């Protein structure tokens, strides 16, 4: 299974530690990648980048600054790949 752990950081200089911890926990079980974007990236660019990599599952780390864009991305990802598994984590999920 090809898995993506991703997020939209608020700035280019930010790094998401949560997805790195998760990657370390599952790297022996699945083929896992990390891709980080920022809220300044165009959603079409992010969608294309994710779609072309052909992931089986995509998990987003969500926060107050990215939740609306991530929801839009999830809707569009499902339109182009209805079989992909999508999961959300982080403080905005609860």
Please name every model-derived segment:
Residues 1-17:
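A short, flexible N-terminal coil/short beta segment enriched in small residues
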Residues 2, 18, 22-26, 31-94:
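Glycine-rich beta-alpha loop elements in corrinoid/cobalamin-binding modules
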